[in-house]
Amino acid sequence: MRVLHLGNIANNAYSNAKFLRRKGVEADVLCYDYAHVMAQPEWEDAEFEGHPDEVNPRWEQVDLNGFRRPAWFIQEELAPRVRGRCKQWFKGQFRLERLVRDPVRWLHVFIKYRLENLLSGTEPRPHAVDFFKIYPARKWFQQWFKGYDLIQAYATEPIHAMLFATGQPYVAFEHGTMREIPFEDSTTGRLLTLAYRQAGRVLITNPDVITSAQRLGLTNFQFIPHPVDETKYRPRPTLLRDQLVNRYQTDLILFAPSRHNWALKGNDLLIRAFARLRKEVGRRAILILSDWGQEVDRSRALIGALELEPVVIWTPPLNKTKLIDYYNAADVVLDQFTLGVFGTVTPEAMACGKPVVLNFNRQVHEWCFPEMPPVLGARTEHEIFERMVEVSEDRGYAAAVGQASREWIVKHHGWELVADRQISVYRELLQR
């Protein structure tokens, strides 16, 4: 079985292909016109120091300690002429933030689509000009697709799979893309809606987008967990913890690696709760934050106003090898406090045996997991503060939650489960 994974936002395709290859599937990844550092195999698996350029890393200038990207990871570019005429379908991972910051747009999208549904009974159909806009890329994609039994297309790439796969079935892999894009009155929105409907299967990784799937009238979808390798993300000793304890004379290490967007992540709630932990409880705690996101300056200003600078440590965005060190050095990992669902931070930290505090909507996840994860739920500043106090005052409780967290990941979120679900889908589609 030969499967091409098209697109590689956040290394999801790379991780899935690795899992599938362990199971004997000949899975390749095609990443074209997108060289972001977090979409590169080196970011996921290499051990290196320093901080490569975010948009166009020069790996030949970095000591990767012997790591070489696998031959099955293919980096390509469309011809300049084609690239100039074809819209770049996926602009990154920040579309959702625009909506959260602009609730009027939420209302506009909802009203517009509701009226169109009432008037026509269906969503807007693609226009002929929509197809002409991407037709120039046809021969490149058809050449890339040759020889594969099936295409798994990520983000907005199902559009290209729908239009240019000649006879192969395709699977659409949704990782946040369904929240907004299909409801746009745009070429991408119209074509993506059609591509989801024409897909052999739509794999959903974010439980909350089931409402989007239902609005689109999809019946061909199923849930699959985010690809996280619990054989790599696991409890292990690290010198980093001793270094942090000795340098800051701390007895509690809190780690919050999420990017800074207050509306989406609730970073301000976390910072204020941490200030209360220091001042009201007197914990000699430190908070480690990641220096990335649109509102880093805003977070820094709040930290300054609360006089927390000496006990807040900033790190640059961490490659995955370093990230595992920080997970294992921490007593508690904190994720987001607004959305009610998790991305990769939560399962990565859980796989490392750490208790995780986040806003978790159990109801949204009931269709996905037979057993809810043993996370520590918190949505408000006071609830975050309470969870911090609980894990700091009862280390036995924190350790038990961490152990249960890893056990849950192995059982309900492990790499083998993720691979087996995809293989089951492929076999079903190829037997039709």
What residue spans do the PLM features occupy?
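A short, active-site helix/loop in glycosyltransferases that binds the activated sugar's phosphate group
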Residues: 160-162, 181, 197-232
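Nucleotide-activated donor-binding/catalytic signature segment of Leloir-type glycosyltransferases, i.e.
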Residues: 297-317, 332
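Acidic anion/phosphate-binding donor-loop and adjacent secondary structure
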Residues: 182-185, 228-243, 250, 325
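Membrane-proximal helix-turn-helix segments that form the acceptor-binding/catalytic region
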Residues: 132-146, 179-202
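Conserved donor-binding/catalytic core segment of Leloir-type glycosyltransferases
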Residues: 203, 237-265, 271-276, 288
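Short hydrophobic beta-strand element within catalytic cores of glycosyltransferases
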Residues: 355-362
